[in-house]
């Protein structure tokens, strides 16, 4: 009778398990493929010739060398080694790699060792020493591909973490490059202001001498002194901005403000010319786009993993134990105990929990798919923005240069007319201010062009080779 009951229970268990395995709720998502997006073959605002390329991998490069500035190259090398944001991203990558190794370990059986020692007895009796040693082996075969899906998902997470590392690196390099050129343009502005200050000081001295000699009005002296003070105030403001930019560059280098100093440098900087053929491969080489695609792949694997919740769990176990009474049974053979077993578990009813988890995974996949498309569109926009600015700055450069030449000539003409007694010194001051404003605007435009070049390269993924 008891044997019949056991058989009936076993048959019922098998039936329920098979019912769970064949449930129509178990869905099998299609194999993951990278979404194909419809993109243009050219950029709307491209002045250069652009070509579309095939898939390539993100690789480390030294894109800043296009500026041909040895100090900038040295700073970028320091940044790559000491930047703390980059170190954080590297640590996150190592964490993702460790999680992948953890998932691979789930394919293998686990081995546990256990032991115990006991010393017992009663009053007037011989103490009893007992030692026990055992081993336990368990293994969960990957019948439904759960471990494989988990590994697939974590591999995608690792790839996303690697892309995130590349994105952080590129962003920090861009920040360092932009800050460096901000400082260099401020150096040039300080040089212009210093030369202007010396010129204005000479004018004040000459006008004072003329005023003392009765050859000039006091109003001319006051106007010249006011103009000199304005330039000195601009020097203070410009120096303050340079100090703040230097502080930013110090942090990017992984140093304290006190540990870092960038000497002033008077130099002529030229906006680099990009290669005539630049591929429109930012869709596949931009780190943020790669990260979004890999996150989508990880979510797809998570969706497949959620589907396996309808399938039963199966585990195989083997245990062995050595039991010996060391003192009281010293000359007797120890006792060996062993057992092996097969265990299966199937969840029949959970109140809709598994359906909800699958729905959540599907919604998450939809979200990541939209995020991937958004990353691609954002990439295109950033390139188009940089191209618009590049073209506009180039047109503005020629006009600005003409304006500076006119302002310089006007200053020279008005100065000669003042020396000839034909105009007041107020006109000289006006002409000098126009020349100074034009020269400063020319430098600021150079600054915008240098930063735009770096931004365009970064928008293309940091690789223009």
Which residue stretches match the model-derived regions?
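Terminal intrinsically disordered/low-complexity segments used for targeting and assembly
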Residues: 3-81, 239-284, 326, 458-465
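Small/polar-residue-enriched beta-strand and adjacent coil segments characteristic
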Residues: 62, 68-71, 75-78, 87-90, ...
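Amphipathic alpha-helical coiled-coil segments and their boundaries
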Residues: 75, 82, 89, 140, ...
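Long, contiguous alpha-helical "rod/stalk" segments
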Residues: 85-90, 94-100, 104, 193, ...
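Regular, well-ordered alpha-helical segments
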Residues: 98, 105, 163, 170, ...
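Periplasmic alpha-helical coiled-coil/stalk elements that build and connect Gram-negative outer-membrane
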Residues: 147, 163-278, 389, 413, ...
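A short glycine-centered flexible hinge/capping loop motif at secondary-structure junctions
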Residues: 211-215, 418-422, 459-463
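Hydrophobic, well-ordered secondary-structure elements that form the walls
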Residues: 344, 361, 368, 390-393, ...
């Amino acid at each position: 009778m008891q044997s019949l009951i056991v058989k009936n229970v076993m048959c019922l268990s098998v039936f329920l398990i098979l019912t769970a395995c064949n449930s129509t709720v178990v869905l099998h998502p299609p194999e993951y493929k990278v979404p194909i997006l419809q993109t243009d073959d050219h950029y709307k605002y491209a002045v250069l010739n652009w070509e579309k390329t095939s898939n390539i991998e993100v690789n480390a490069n030294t894109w800043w060398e296009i500026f041909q500035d040895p100090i900038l190259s040295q700073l970028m090398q320091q940044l790559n080694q000491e930047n703390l944001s980059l170190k954080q991203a590297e640590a996150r990558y190592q964490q993702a790699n460790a999680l992948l190794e953890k998932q691979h370990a789930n394919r293998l059986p686990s081995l546990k060792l256990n032991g115990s020692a006991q010393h017992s007895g009663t009053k007037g009796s011989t103490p009893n020493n007992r030692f026990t040693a055992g081993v336990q082996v368990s293994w969960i075969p990957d019948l439904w591909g759960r471990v494989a899906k988990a590994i697939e998902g974590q591999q995608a997470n690792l790839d996303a973490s690697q892309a995130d590392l590349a994105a952080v690196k590129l962003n920090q390099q861009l920040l360092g490059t932009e800050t460096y050129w901000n400082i260099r343009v401020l150096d040039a502005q300080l040089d212009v202001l210093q030369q202007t200050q010396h010129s204005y000081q000479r004018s004040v001295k000459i006008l004072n001498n003329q005023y003392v000699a009765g050859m000039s009005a006091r109003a001319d002296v006051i106007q010249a002194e006011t103009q000199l003070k304005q330039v000195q105030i601009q020097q203070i403001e410009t120096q303050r901005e340079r100090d703040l930019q230097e502080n930013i560059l110090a942090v990017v280098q992984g140093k304290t403000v006190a540990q870092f100093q960038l000497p002033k440098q008077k130099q002529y900087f030229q906006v680099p010319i990009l290669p005539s053929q630049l591929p429109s491969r930012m869709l596949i080489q931009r780190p943020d786009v790669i990260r979004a695609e890999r996150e989508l792949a990880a979510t797809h694997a998570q969706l497949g993993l959620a589907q396996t919740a309808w399938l039963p769990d199966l585990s195989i176990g083997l245990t062995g134990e050595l039991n010996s009474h060391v003192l009281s049974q010293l000359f007797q053979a120890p006792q060996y105990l062993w057992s092996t077993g097969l265990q299966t578990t199937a969840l029949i009813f959970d109140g809709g929990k598994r359906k909800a988890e699958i729905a959540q995974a599907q919604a998450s996949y939809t979200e990541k798919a939209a995020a991937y498309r958004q990353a691609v569109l954002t990439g295109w926009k950033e390139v188009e923005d940089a191209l618009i600015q590049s073209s506009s700055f180039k047109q503005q450069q020629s006009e600005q240069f003409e304006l500076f030449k006119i302002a310089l000539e006007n200053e020279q003409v008005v100065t000669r007319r003042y020396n000839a007694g034909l105009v007041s010194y107020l006109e000289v001051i006006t002409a000098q201010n126009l020349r100074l404003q034009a020269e400063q605007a020319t430098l600021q435009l150079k600054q915008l062009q240098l930063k735009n070049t770096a931004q365009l390269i970064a928008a293309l993924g940091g690789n223009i080779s």
